[in-house]
């Protein structure tokens, strides 16, 4: 019989909290949950409150809530007024002075949702890091989720920080996001930006890879059962592999002439393509925030201005962008009192 003599290690307050947050329960909390759950709850609650009750009349001159007759596609929590600059619009700040109604009217809910939403997304990423460490796996899920975080932060925070105010960020709504896309095209020629092209290639390429991968796995499932249905060809708890990598490799070698040689390279490529697309899009948006130009083919514009018979798809798109700027600016920024004389409004070369 062995008797161990020693002093029991004292447990401080940190150890007690650490035990509680990491306790095995239906929904794991963890240290990241202390950031994730409150911020996500407040961001979602603020968005539901804003789309239900809060008008955008004082910031954009628009109706934007269910209470005013909007539906799910047209409601939004709009950005603050241009005059607010880059103020955090705290409820107790000098703009609202503790008045909740005034705070909603000047766009305080948008700042509330944007900041809490950003921290909520970061908390979700940290949650994946934390659980991966506890379970003992690699943190590639968290690395992959950095892509959506980069896009959200660049679009909703970095872009308006590079512009005059939060006013130029997207409002939180479906139709509002569409309006923001038109704005980016008209004022930044976004679709011709190489970072946008890389982003589209990454996202659509990732979707294609997912479709091909899922179909290939379904095609090569082992037919161990009696039924013809591939979903009954294996038991979910079996330890053996359920599909043939060799058969899949042979199939795609015949289709393309090349195929992935192992699963590690295949799945890393499926991770790399969409995440790289998201990150390049985020870099492009930061460039737009700084008003950097890309792919301006001035020589074609000059020739089109001199020769009425010369026109390319690029020059036609430039005219469309001018139209977006001319018609959107007056509607989107009524506080500027834009008045465009007839001679500056865009028109085709043939007119």
Swiss-Prot record:
<keyword id="KW-0793">Thylakoid</keyword>
<dbReference type="GO" id="GO:0005506">
    <property type="term" value="F:iron ion binding"/>
</dbReference>
<keyword id="KW-0157">Chromophore</keyword>
<comment type="similarity">
    <text>Belongs to the reaction center PufL/M/PsbA/D family.</text>
</comment>
<dbReference type="GO" id="GO:0009772">
    <property type="term" value="P:photosynthetic electron transport in photosystem II"/>
</dbReference>
<feature type="binding site" description="axial binding residue">
    <location>
        <position position="196"/>
    </location>
    <ligand>
        <name>chlorophyll a PD2</name>
    </ligand>
</feature>
<feature type="binding site">
    <location>
        <position position="213"/>
    </location>
    <ligand>
        <name>a plastoquinone</name>
    </ligand>
</feature>
<keyword id="KW-0934">Plastid</keyword>
<feature type="transmembrane region" description="Helical">
    <location>
        <begin position="206"/>
        <end position="226"/>
    </location>
</feature>
<feature type="binding site">
    <location>
        <position position="260"/>
    </location>
    <ligand>
        <name>a plastoquinone</name>
    </ligand>
</feature>
<keyword id="KW-0604">Photosystem II</keyword>
<keyword id="KW-0812">Transmembrane</keyword>
<comment type="function">
    <text>Photosystem II (PSII) is a light-driven water:plastoquinone oxidoreductase that uses light energy to abstract electrons from H(2)O, generating O(2) and a proton gradient subsequently used for ATP formation. It consists of a core antenna complex that captures photons, and an electron transfer chain that converts photonic excitation into a charge separation. The D1/D2 (PsbA/PsbD) reaction center heterodimer binds P680, the primary electron donor of PSII as well as several subsequent electron acceptors. D2 is needed for assembly of a stable PSII complex.</text>
</comment>
<keyword id="KW-0460">Magnesium</keyword>
<keyword id="KW-0479">Metal-binding</keyword>
<keyword id="KW-0150">Chloroplast</keyword>
<keyword id="KW-0813">Transport</keyword>
<keyword id="KW-0148">Chlorophyll</keyword>
<keyword id="KW-0560">Oxidoreductase</keyword>
<feature type="transmembrane region" description="Helical">
    <location>
        <begin position="123"/>
        <end position="139"/>
    </location>
</feature>
<feature type="transmembrane region" description="Helical">
    <location>
        <begin position="39"/>
        <end position="59"/>
    </location>
</feature>
<dbReference type="InterPro" id="IPR000484">
    <property type="entry name" value="Photo_RC_L/M"/>
</dbReference>
<feature type="binding site">
    <location>
        <position position="141"/>
    </location>
    <ligand>
        <name>pheophytin a</name>
    </ligand>
</feature>
<dbReference type="Pfam" id="PF00124">
    <property type="entry name" value="Photo_RC"/>
</dbReference>
<keyword id="KW-0408">Iron</keyword>
<dbReference type="GO" id="GO:0045156">
    <property type="term" value="F:electron transporter, transferring electrons within the cyclic electron transport pathway of photosynthesis activity"/>
</dbReference>
<keyword id="KW-1133">Transmembrane helix</keyword>
<feature type="binding site">
    <location>
        <position position="128"/>
    </location>
    <ligand>
        <name>pheophytin a</name>
    </ligand>
</feature>
<dbReference type="GO" id="GO:0009523">
    <property type="term" value="C:photosystem II"/>
</dbReference>
<dbReference type="InterPro" id="IPR036854">
    <property type="entry name" value="Photo_II_D1/D2_sf"/>
</dbReference>
<keyword id="KW-0472">Membrane</keyword>
<dbReference type="InterPro" id="IPR055265">
    <property type="entry name" value="Photo_RC_L/M_CS"/>
</dbReference>
<dbReference type="InterPro" id="IPR005868">
    <property type="entry name" value="PSII_PsbD/D2"/>
</dbReference>
<feature type="transmembrane region" description="Helical">
    <location>
        <begin position="151"/>
        <end position="164"/>
    </location>
</feature>
<dbReference type="GO" id="GO:0009535">
    <property type="term" value="C:chloroplast thylakoid membrane"/>
</dbReference>
<feature type="binding site">
    <location>
        <position position="267"/>
    </location>
    <ligand>
        <name>Fe cation</name>
    </ligand>
</feature>
<dbReference type="GO" id="GO:0016491">
    <property type="term" value="F:oxidoreductase activity"/>
</dbReference>
<keyword id="KW-0602">Photosynthesis</keyword>
<keyword id="KW-0249">Electron transport</keyword>
<feature type="transmembrane region" description="Helical">
    <location>
        <begin position="277"/>
        <end position="293"/>
    </location>
</feature>
<dbReference type="InterPro" id="IPR055266">
    <property type="entry name" value="D1/D2"/>
</dbReference>
<feature type="binding site">
    <location>
        <position position="213"/>
    </location>
    <ligand>
        <name>Fe cation</name>
    </ligand>
</feature>
